[in-house]
UniProtKB/Swiss-Prot annotation:
Encoding gene, per UniProt annotation: Fen1
Record's protein name: Flap endonuclease 1
Record-listed E.C. numbers: 3.1.-.-
Record region (N-domain): 1-104
Lineage summary: Eukaryota, Metazoa, Ecdysozoa, Arthropoda, Hexapoda
This protein's record includes keyword Electron transport: no
Cofactor(s) required, per the database record: Mg(2+)
UniProt source species: Drosophila persimilis (Fruit fly)
GO molecular function, one term: 5'-3' exonuclease activity
Region (I-domain): 122-253
Length: 386
C-alpha cells in the first residue's frame, strides 16, 4: 500500500521536491531497486498485453524476461542497479496482509462469476488482481541476477527499509520503487517509474527527501507521524482525516500525541488500541542489515550460464539471450566513465541535515540583511546614490 495520498500531497505543497528526468540523467548512479515491486510489474505487464510467457510445463517466465531485459536497459543507460528482496514481513503488517487476503478471496469469487458470464474484460481485471510474487519467482530472479553479474541483497524484513539504509549509508544514490514509504524510512532520494517499460514513455520522477521536509515544514519525526496519519501498512489511521487535514494537524501540533489531546473525537474516530507508537518506531528503527558492511559488486556476465538457465525448458531465444549477454559485457566495460560529482565524497545522510542547512541559510540571510541596512544607512548620510 505504501503511504496513502503522499505523492499528491508533496506535488501540491512541496512541488520543488519533485523533478522529472529521462533515464539517461542517472548515468553513473548506483540505485537500490525494490525487487518484489519489479517482479510484480513484470507479471502484471505481460498479463495486460495478453502474452503467455511460460516454460514447457506451463510455469510463468514473464518475471525473468522482464528482469533480464529491463536490467540490460538500465545498464545501457549507465545505471548500476542493486536489487533488494523482501524478507519476513514485520508483525505489525499482519493486519494489512489479512486485508489483502480478504481482497484476494473477493477477487477469486469475482473471477469465477466473470468466467461463468464469459466477460473477458472482467476476467482480465480480476486475473490481474490475483497476481502475486512468490518465493519461487524471487529465487529464480536471484539466480538470473547472479548470472548477469548484478548484485542483490536479501533484506531481513522490508525491502524499502533496506533500500533506504543503503542510500543513507552512501552505498547507492537512490531507492527505486513505487511505494512512497521508502521516504518514510528516510531514503534521501526516491525514483518512481525507473523500471517501467520504454513503451510507456514515463519520465522518471525523482523525490528529494530534504526538499519535501522543507516544503511541508516538518522534520523527519513529524514527517513519520504525518505518514501514519495518511495511512500506512503498519496500523490503522484516524477515520475522517484526509491529506489536507493531516498536514494541518501536524503543522499545528507537531506530533500525534498532541493531536490526540486536541482532537474533536465527536468528528473523528480514533482506532481502538491504536499502535501508532510501534509503527513510528518501526519507521525510525527498522529491521535492516548493516548497510555499511554490504559489499556491492557488479561482475561480468556468464553467457553460457545464461543460455543454459533461460533457454531449453524456459524457451527463451538463444540468439536474443547471447545478444543480451554481449550488451551486459559492453555496458560493464563502458562504465569506466564517471559523474563529475563522484570525485567528491558523499557523506551518509543525517535526518536533521535539512534543518541545519535551513538554519544556516536563515542566518546567512539575516546577516546579509543587516549588512544591507548598514549600507543603506551610510548612503543616506553620504553622497546621494546615482
Amino acid at each position: 500500500m505504501g503511504i496513502l495520498g503522499l505523492s499528491k500531497l508533496i506535488a501540491d505543497l512541496a512541488p520543488q521536491a519533485i523533478r522529472e528526468s529521462e533515464m539517461k540523467h542517472f548515468f553513473g548512479r548506483k540505485v537500490a531497486i525494490d525487487a518484489s515491486m519489479c517482479l510484480y510489474q513484470f507479471l502484471i505487464a505481460v498479463r495486460s498485453e495478453g502474452a503467455q510467457l511460460a516454460t514447457v510445463n506451463g510455469d510463468p517466465t514473464s518475471h525473468l524476461m522482464g528482469m533480464f531485459y529491463r536490467t540490460i536497459r538500465l545498464l545501457d543507460n549507465g545505471i548500476k542497479p542493486v536489487y533488494v528482496f523482501d524478507g519476513k514481513p514485520p508483525d505489525l503488517k499482519s493486519g494489512e496482509l489479512a486485508k489483502r487476503a480478504e481482497r484476494r478471496e473477493e477477487a477469486e469469487k469475482a473471477l469465477k462469476a466473470a468466467t461463468d458470464a464469459g466477460d473477458d474484460a472482467e476476467i482480465e481485471k480480476f486475473n490481474r488482481r490475483l497476481v502475486r510474487v512468490t518465493k519461487e519467482h524471487a529465487r529464480e530472479a536471484k539466480e538470473l541476477l547472479s548470472l548477469m553479474g548484478v548484485p542483490y541483497v536479501d533484506a531481513p524484513c522490508e525491502a524499502e527499509a533496506q533500500c533506504a539504509a543503503l542510500v543513507k549509508a552512501g552505498k547507492v544514490y537512490a531507492t527505486a520503487t513505487e511505494d512512497m514509504d521508502a521516504l518514510t524510512f528516510g531514503s534521501t532520494k526516491l525514483l518512481r517509474y525507473l523500471t517501467y517499460s520504454e513503451a510507456r514513455k514515463m519520465p522518471v520522477k525523482e523525490f528529494s527527501y530534504d526538499k519535501l521536509l522543507e516544503g511541508l515544514e516538518v522534520n523527519n519525526r513529524e514527517f513519520i507521524d504525518l505518514c501514519i496519519l495518511l495511512g500506512c501498512d503498519y496500523c490503522e489511521s484516524i477515520k475522517g482525516i484526509g491529506p489536507k487535514r493531516a498536514i494541518e494537524l501536524i503543522n499545528n501540533y507537531r506530533d500525534i500525541e498532541t493531536i490526540l489531546d486536541n482532537l474533536d473525537t465527536s468528528k473523528y474516530t480514533v482506532p481502538e488500541n491504536w499502535n501508532y507508537k510501534v509503527a513510528r518506531e518501526l519507521f525510525i528503527e527498522p529491521e535492516v542489515a548493516d548497510a555499511s558492511a554490504i559489499d556491492l559488486k557488479w561482475t561480468e556476465p556468464d553467457e553460457e550460464g545464461l543460455v543454459k538457465f533461460l533457454c531449453g525448458d524456459r524457451q527463451f531465444s538463444e540468439e536474443r539471450v547471447r545478444n543480451g549477454a554481449k550488451k551486459l559485457l559492453k555496458s560493464k566495460h563502458a562504465q569506466t566513465q564517471v559523474r563529475l560529482d563522484s570525485f567528491f565524497k558523499t557523506l551518509p545522510s543525517t535526518p536533521n541535515a535539512v534543518h541545519a542547512a535551513k538554519r544556516k541559510a536563515e542566518e546567512a540571510k539575516k546577516s546579509a540583511n543587516n549588512k544591507k541596512a548598514k549600507t543603506s544607512g551610510g548612503a543616506a548620510r553620504g553622497r546621494r546614490p546615482k
